[in-house]
Regions:
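Active-site activation/catalytic loop segments of kinase-like enzymes and analogous catalytic loops
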Residues: 3-47, 63-82
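All-alpha amphipathic helical-bundle segments outside canonical DNA-binding/catalytic cores
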Residues: 49-61
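General structural signal for secondary-structure boundaries
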Residues: 30, 50-51, 109, 113
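Generic alpha-helical secondary structure signal
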Residues: 28-35, 55, 89, 93-96, ...
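ATP/Mg2+ or Mg2+-diphosphate-binding catalytic cores
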Residues: 67-123
C-alpha cells in the first residue's frame, strides 16, 4: 500500500502539468519535485519500510500513472459515470496526460531509482 500512496502523490504533484492539462505533450515527471518529495517521505519512514518497498517506489509511480490513464479512459468510454467532468472529453484529456506522464517516467526510471537510493543513504 505504501507504493500506491507514494506513487499517486508523485503522479499528481510531480507532473509538469496538471492532470487534466490539454497539453499532454508537456506532461512529464519533474525530477526535482520527485527528489524533494522522496527525501521528505523517506526521512521519517525508511526505518519502517522493507528494502523491496523502497526499491519499488519509482515503479509505483509508473504503475499509478498507468492505472489512472486506464481508469480515465475507461470512464470516458463508459460515458463518464465515475470521475466528475467539466466538459465532454475531460476524461480523455486526463487519460492522454497520464499516458504521456507514464512514458516520461519509463524513460527516466533509472534516474528515479538512483534518486531513491541517494535519498535513502542521506537518511
Amino acid at each position: 500500500l505504501v507504493g500506491h500512496d507514494f506513487g499517486d502523490a508523485i503522479r499528481f504533484a510531480a507532473n509538469y502539468v496538471e492532470e487534466d492539462s490539454p497539453h499532454a505533450d508537456q506532461a512529464g515527471i519533474n525530477l526535482d519535485i520527485f527528489r524533494t518529495f522522496t527525501q521528505g517521505f523517506l526521512k521519517p519512514t525508511a526505518h519502517a519500510l522493507t528494502e523491496l518497498e523502497i526499491a519499488t517506489l519509482p515503479l509505483s509511480c509508473l504503475v499509478l500513472a498507468c492505472e489512472l490513464s486506464v481508469r480515465f479512459l475507461d470512464d470516458y468510454l463508459l460515458g463518464d459515470p465515475y470521475f466528475k467532468i467539466n466538459y465532454p472529453s475531460h476524461n480523455l484529456v486526463r487519460a492522454r496526460c497520464q499516458i504521456a506522464l507514464a512514458k516520461d517516467m519509463l524513460a527516466k526510471m533509472e534516474q528515479m531509482e538512483q534518486i531513491v537510493q541517494e535519498c535513502l543513504h542521506a537518511c
